[in-house]
Amino acid sequence: MIATSSFVPLRVHSHGSLLYGVASPEALVERALEQGLHSLALTDRDNLYLAVRFYQAALTEGLQPLLGCLITTRDHEALIICVDRRGFANLCELLTARMLNPRFDLASALARTDTATPAAGLHIIVESPGLAASLLQAGIPAARGVREEPHSVRGADGGL
């Protein structure tokens, strides 16, 4: 099918998100193409384990891949999309900090002073007004309340 939709699903989990996703990166790419999408983001929970596999599968099939992650903390979650290689490197650093620190705080990690621009190359989407305020206070712009239509990419059975 020829890609016709300008809609881009951003909150997509593969089986790399244990208990949250069941599809392989290849199956996600195939389903996106069946739905007429031209682009798809893979945003597994707290990891990038299958990012390269997804990226390669998408490029092979002519789908524009977006890489990102859903970073979760005890109180909040943020959907982070990489804009470029620098963003991917910064997301890797954030995920490392998240894994090493049980009290990880996204706003503090993005505002740290040991790295000049920890949020460079990243789009940060949050639903929590508190997290959005913390990010803005730290000088990090965040999009708030961005929603998808859940039926747009899901099949009749609700899955990809």
Residue ranges, per PLM feature:
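Phosphodiester-processing cores and adjacent nucleic acid-binding clamps
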Residues: 1-160
